[in-house]
Amino acid sequence: VKQGLYNNGGDGYVVARLATAVGIEVTLLAQESDKPLPEEAALAREAWLNAGGEIHASNIVWPESVDLIVDALLGTGLRQAPRESISQLIDHANSHPAPIAAVDIPSGLLAETGATPGAVINADHTITFIALKPGLLTGKARDVTGQLHFDSLGLDSWLAGQETKSQRFSAEQ
């Protein structure tokens, strides 16, 4: 599991903990930062460590016997090209022979537009939650998301009652 610093990184800790709980061997690589994690991500990190999980620096030598890379580096908040250190991790993952599953959105793909302003994960599968992000269906998404999987997490009826920011305009007015 390759994981980042924000809420998508929290998702990476959850995936790692759940995989370990069912007997899957996990190596978790995390970016170091002076900034504190958001509360939910920090709780997920703590749960991973309390379950006996280890966190490895992202610059370790990767094992060749990797069966799956889970991309939880960058999430839907990305607005620009990934920093150089993240770009190097993305390039390393893309060059590894193991398949890649992206959590929510491939790192480097902009959630609103589907643009790829820099390095981007070339996922074999992308698992997204709650709502389909426009960037998963437009721009370069077709080239980098692989097979797209969606789960509303049971929020369908709640989402149906929400107002959107979008408005329709009539040419007749």
Residue spans for each PLM region:
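YjeF_N-associated NAD(P)HX repair module
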Residues: 66-173
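A cross-family phosphate/adenosyl-ligand binding-site feature
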Residues: 2-69, 74, 79-84
